[in-house]
Amino acid sequence: RSRTIDRLILGRNVVRFVIDEAHCFSAWGQDFRVDYLYIGDFIRSIQEKKNMAEPIPVSCFTATAKQKVIEDIRSYFREKLSLEFEVFASKASRTNLHFKVLAQTDAAQKYQTLRRLLEAKSCPTIVYASRTHRATELARCLTRDGFPARAYHGRMDTREKTANQNAFIAGEFQIMVATSAFGMGVDKKDVGMVIHYDISDSLENYIQEAGRAGRNERIEAECYVLFNEDDLNKHFVLLNQTKISFKEIQQVWK
């Protein structure tokens, strides 16, 4: 919807539109984004302004799409651009990833287990936490205890986030403590361990987050969940906080 982008594309020979995170098209996906629904109109507008005889090819990519989401994506482009998509699905199996759930009785034991795992395997590691303050605090505590770590979450300054991400990818430090905000567009091949300090908010998100380990198939990677029964209660509280109230809907409508 940016006029600048519109002008840039009109001045270039576009041979294909490639769309990543395509599950965002579908209301059934865990990351539905309204902005994605403008893409079809944008592509059609470009084709009309260029007076193109043939439609511009479109490719969509996603690592987390149920069958219903796939059908939504195909239906969207069929209706908007009269395009029929062919589906290429890779296997979900990652034989070099080893999954383990470690039961924890309380917060103290969970932190000690985290330290033990980091001591046992020195490698690029992502530790996922459910809240921004938890990510910041864990990174601070780990660094204090001799495990240099940095945090990454949505409330951080953009420059700091970018600096931490780039330093992690470059291998300047090994432990990234992050919320689910970390990962999109990140492709670090040598991550040998992903630890979920808190459970993910969906199975799809968990698969995507754990799948950031072992991108190099020659690496045997570990994926741990440190689970405590209280985590479920906290998880439901977080989910309830994301619900939109009727009053909020009325305010948006106004």
Show the residue positions of the predicted features.
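Helicase motor core with emphasis on the C-terminal RecA-like subdomain
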Residues: 1-254
